[in-house]
Amino acid sequence: LTAMRNHQKTFTMLLVLVLIGLNMRPLLTSVGPLLPQLRQASGMSFSVAALLTALPVVTMGGLALAGSWLHQHVSERRSVAISLLLIAVGALMRELYPQSALLLSSALLGGVGIGIIQAVMPSVIKRRFQQRTPLVMGLWSAALMGGGGLGAAITPWLVQHSETWYQTLAWWALPAVVALFAWWWQSPREVASSHKTTTTPVRVVFTPRAWTLGVYFGLINGGYASLIAWLPAFYIEIGASAQYSGSLLALMTLGQAAGALLMPAMARHQDRRKLLMLALVLQLVGFCGFIWLPMQLPVLWAMVCGLGLGGAFPLCLLLALDHSVQPAIAGKLVAFMQGIGFIIAGLAPWFSGVLRSISGNYLMDWAFHALCVVGLMIITLRFAPVRFPQLWVKEA
């Protein structure tokens, strides 16, 4: 009977994690299919419009770096609840007529909520699901990306069935409110307070490997951030409809969800390099397809690129967690990696917007990210488990 109750609690907690994960990306991906209309209504340039994606992502990075402080001063229950409330308020702000300051404020507010949750969840998963960390991390990542797909696919459909097109963006407050109630109901049984540790302090900021992981994570997620910001606009520009362009982004995130579930499940050995290399090859194929054959096989390029991006995200988290058996040290490393990484990733859509303004098309953007993937392949070779810093492995 006790075992059955434990299984029920575990299953319920997994459902709540999925609900929360589904709210991590619609604030970003729902904008892409409406970007031409938003730019026209607000008068934003390409580089300013890119901030709608860049601001939340950079904010995620800053809050990931503050992860240790959050763990020490705010309970997990409260921090996640407040974060979901911020996401809901950020979405509701978009019910008003689109103006640059309002849209950017909503992006920043939602980014704070997303950033806090992403700083908290890896350590929650590592502690709560120690024996199944790769699978649960994959499920969490798949929920993130699945939510992104819903944002891209459903928003154009909502526009078609709404009297005021921009107010459809406010509908994404609803799933955040649902997740808030689910978390508040479930969390007292699972994570009622923050878990302070008395372990020896380890300053990962002074280790070259931590910075390598941060840059690695950032360049991978930079490709994702640029795609959710500009892929629909790219296809609208070359003749596709907003609905079709949003569907392509949704298919890309569907591929991401599949990659996030499948690749961690295949990660049976501590050496993650083969799977990371596979994920990077898939990304390279996708970006090259966008450059040379964008209209011939757009669904294939979107899904292949998504599969690679989706697989790489949880594999990066696992790679960082592998560096220490101590949850406290591993959590610090993941927080630092995500902090530096999301700041770099947040700059990618802005830089892509600048390249678009300079070149007059998006081909230079995709070429830039293809070159980044080649560089990431070279860095991947350095991630042999025998080269992990031994201090992190042994020290508590």
What are these regions (language model features)?
Residues 78-92, 274-289:
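Structural signature of the two symmetry-related core transmembrane helices
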Residues 62-101:
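Conserved MFS/SLC helix-loop-helix module at the cytosolic interface between two early adjacent transmembrane helices
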Residues 31-32, 208-250, 255-260:
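Extracytoplasmic gate region of multi-pass secondary transporters
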Residues 130-188:
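Helix-loop-helix hairpin linking two adjacent transmembrane segments in secondary transporters
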